[in-house]
Amino acid sequence: MMDTAIATIRAREILDSRGRPTVEAEVELECGIVGLAQVPSGASTGSFEAHELRDGDPKRYGGKGVLSAVENIETRILSALVDLNALDQTVIDQCLLELDGSENKSNLGANAILAVSLATAKAAAEYLGQPLYRYLGGPLANVLPVPMMNVINGGAHAANNIDFQEFMIMPIGAPSFREGLRWGAEVFAALSKVLADKGLLTGVGDEGGFAPNLDSNQAALDILLQAIETAGYRPGTDVALALDVAANEFYEDGKYVFDNTSRTASELIRYYDQLVSTYPIISIEDGLQEEDWDNWALLTETLGSRIQLVGDDLFVTNPKRLQRGIDNGVANAILIKLNQIGSLTETLQTIDLATRKGYRAVISHRSGETEDTTIADLAVATRAGQIKTGSLCRSERVAKYNRLLRIEAELGDQAVYAPKVGLGPR
């Protein structure tokens, strides 16, 4: 039996950062090497995401348990993968997809499939004595992403009255990832003081950003500019702004309802145009509802040459939906969430399609995270140039930043910060 053959697979139900169950898997090779992976879970989920298998037993975790996914791993998946070569990631993932047999991974569960897919890759990398980013990305994996730091949370990520889900800062002017992280942390500290001085709450939301009650979405942008300047940086030059609007969450009967106002898609696009003209916003994610394709094309026509327009719920890391966007001139970037599509191979294929067609890829966490740092390695492996992994607090967020610091140090003089080579937001 070859050393890289899969000998056994173990799985368990663990907790994510919201205290909800999620799946952890260990893939052990014949040589004794073990790869371990944990999968995240989202709060604002797109309708077309791969299916996350939950038990539905109200007596356990309010029906959110994942023992059925764990059982699938330790029975059906183990039987199918035992003795296969862990170095053949494409074969492993194809076997998992065929075993599931559904369009959205609802039989085995995307959470079960992804946990095993990632754990296999980690075991293979460990066997070869390579860090995960090098195993996945080869010798050209040397670009450190610019972080999109979610410092004010709203929408489905916080119990406050702000409609837009994420207000982010991006240290685009920094000379390195390490310095960019420092700049972001200093702005975050300044933001805490600005909020406190205004008598606003400094409690944090799911992703570690502050979650104050504010009069409007624009009030959040004004406070961010103040925090950037208080920290000693220049808005737009050193530190830019980005939004995740998550428009699905306030789309009602064909209208977009926020700030106590109902808007048509055309009115909302004009509103975005005004925001971009007023504030140093360089990226807007999910600016319209996930099936509002015609108006997405209008939004792209209006703003696509000036800023990055990211599809998250719109594309759900799915190459078929991305191809539809490409064919119809919709958006110019895609958010990449491993658990939206449910396997490593499909994720890499989607990133490759985006890159070939001139779309930027933004590697992303979920609001329900774990200490798993795979997305940090994935960002470097794919030269994506951007990563979303929350704010500058909560250890499940900071773990990814710290992993990127270690990768940058490991790369030494070979490390390149994405904005320096034109791989940040357009």
From Swiss-Prot:
It catalyses: (2R)-2-phosphoglycerate = phosphoenolpyruvate + H2O. Its EC number is 4.2.1.11. It holds the Pfam family Enolase_N. The active site is at residues 207, 337. (2R)-2-phosphoglycerate binds at residues 165, 337, 366-367, 388. It is an enzyme of class 4 (lyase). Pathway: Carbohydrate degradation; glycolysis; pyruvate from D-glyceraldehyde 3-phosphate: step 4/5. GO terms for molecular function: magnesium ion binding; phosphopyruvate hydratase activity. Its cofactor is Mg(2+). Mg(2+) binds at residues 244, 285, 312. One of its GO terms (biological process) is glycolytic process. GO terms for cellular component: cell surface; extracellular region; phosphopyruvate hydratase complex. Binds a second Mg(2+) ion via substrate during catalysis. Transmembrane segments: none annotated. CDD domains: enolase. It is found in: Cytoplasm; Secreted; Cell surface. Keywords: Cytoplasm, Glycolysis, Lyase, Magnesium, Metal-binding, Secreted. Catalyzes the reversible conversion of 2-phosphoglycerate (2-PG) into phosphoenolpyruvate (PEP). It is essential for the degradation of carbohydrates via glycolysis. Belongs to the enolase family. PANTHER family: ENOLASE. This is Enolase. It comes from Thermosynechococcus vestitus (strain NIES-2133 / IAM M-273 / BP-1). The gene is eno.
